[in-house]
């Protein structure tokens, strides 16, 4: 019989309800504007390289031996594509200030970020069962940017043992290496852990590593241990844990 030791959660549209496309649009436009000012370039000249660099990061098309953090990978792509060294201290500090002090104020009716129904109850139920928790959000953003969204979801005080960011990760979802590396930092095996997420692609490791997923997205996922709404997760958790331990 398997033993469940930890539950690891996705964030966007799992614990946090958010119009992610709107958020990315605002974030990308603001950062492009800042970099355009630094480089003294027209802002429109940065849209393509910024988008291409982010796409390259999220495509995960990297050599097996590439050990750069996602932050370093993105910075290298930006410098190669438009000549801006975003890790230089003055530029890095400017971007960090924006993400810590300005971005949190950008939540509006369009982005509409707020705790997802049932999210806090889900986390508390897992903790009440004596299990460990971590936040395995896709690490294609900085710690500051991720903490901004955690704040919108009232998650900053949750006792996550790990939050994956582009500073501490070398791959993105759904890479099996991303999941393996994240669990290794926690001292956990995939067979001891339950993933909770809404994305039918990114929240299922590829290739499979034996990590089971409770799916809280739209529709039904035949490969999930359990499918349902975030609001139902806490109510069904005893049954979910039983199915996990029975190897279903």
What residue spans do the PLM features occupy?
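Active-site neighborhood of HAD-like aspartate-dependent phosphohydrolases
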Residues: 1-52
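Residues at alpha-helix caps and immediate loop-helix transition turns in enzyme cores, especially N-
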Residues: 20-23, 27, 115, 145-148, ...
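Short acidic alpha-helix initiation/capping motifs at coil-to-helix transition points
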Residues: 22-31, 66-79, 140-141
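Short, surface-exposed acidic
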Residues: 36-52, 80-97, 156-160, 191
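Short, acidic loop-to-helix structural element flanking the phosphoryl-transfer center
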Residues: 66-69, 92, 96, 103-134
């Amino acid at each position: 019989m398997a033993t469940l030791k930890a539950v690891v959660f996705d964030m966007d549209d799992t614990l946090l309800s958010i119009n992610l496309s709107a958020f990315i649009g605002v974030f990308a436009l603001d950062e492009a504007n800042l970099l355009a000012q630094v480089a003294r370039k027209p802002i429109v000249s940065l849209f393509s390289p910024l988008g291409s660099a982010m796409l390259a990061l999220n495509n995960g098309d990297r050599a097996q031996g590439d050990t750069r953090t996602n932050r370093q990978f993105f910075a290298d792509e930006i410098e190669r594509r438009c000549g801006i060294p975003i890790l230089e201290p003055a530029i890095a500090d400017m971007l960090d200030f924006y993400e810590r002090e300005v971005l949190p104020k950008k939540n509006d009716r369009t982005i509409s970020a707020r705790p997802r129904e049932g999210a806090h109850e889900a986390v508390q139920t897992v903790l009440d069962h004596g299990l460990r928790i971590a936040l395995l959000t896709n690490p294609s953003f900085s710690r500051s940017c991720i903490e901004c969204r955690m704040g919108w979801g009232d998650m900053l005080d949750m006792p996550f043992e790990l939050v994956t960011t582009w500073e501490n990760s070398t791959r993105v979802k759904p890479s099996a290496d991303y999941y393996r590396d994240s669990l290794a930092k926690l001292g956990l095996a995939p067979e001891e852990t339950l993933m909770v997420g809404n994305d039918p692609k990114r929240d299922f490791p590829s290739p499979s590593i034996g990590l089971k997923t409770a799916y809280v997205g739209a529709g039904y996922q035949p490969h999930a241990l359990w499918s349902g709404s975030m609001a139902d997760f806490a109510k069904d958790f005893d049954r979910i844990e039983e199915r996990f331990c029975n190897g279903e």
